[in-house]
Each structure stands twice: as C-alpha cells, then as structure tokens.
C-alpha cells in the first residue's frame, strides 16, 4: 500500500488536472481553445514571416502552436532582445541553451492580447535595431 505521503503526490496531480479541465470548460472547451491557439500562433508567425530582423527557425509545415522559436541571426542582438524584452515584462524568451535564439511559449493560458503586445514590442525593437 502507498503511504499517505506518496499518495498525496497523486492527489495533488489529480486536483490540478481537475482545475485545468474546469478552466478549459469555462473558456469554451477544446475546440474554442484550438481556435484561440491557432489565432495566437498566426499573429506571431505572420509577423515573423514578414520581419526584416526576426526569422522563424522551423519550416512552416512543422510549426508548433505552442512554442515559437525565432532568431535575429546575431547572437549579441538576440541577447539584447531578451534583456530588453525581460525589462518590458516579457519573460522566459531566451531559447534553449544549446540552440540559442529565442522561444515564445504561447500556451493555453496566454491571452491573445499577450501575443499582440509581444509582436508590438518586436516591431519596436526591429525599428530600433534593424
């Protein structure tokens, strides 16, 4: 038999899953979340596809709705972007330590407005640094 301490781990996971499922239902269900995630990804990818400074690093047919990696092509400029973005309230944009660049994680809880604000910031950064 599991000790109560060991089973508490599972209880916590089930509790958190229940909270997430209720939130998803409140937001309109999976089909609504899928539409929201597609819209968020489109906003960001459309900007990256036309940007003179930022470039997506994944082929169009392989793109994720949740994690959007991108680069400037210059490691120093990438670092400057991450630093300025963090100061502006956009956190955890630094890419994987072995790959570099940046990565925007636009999971379910990220509102569309958050992605729009990120793109606005990226446009400003591009204007100042391209």
Go through the PLM ranges and name each one:
Residues 14-22, 42-45, 79-82, 116-119:
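Predominant activation on well-ordered alpha-helical scaffold segments within soluble catalytic domains
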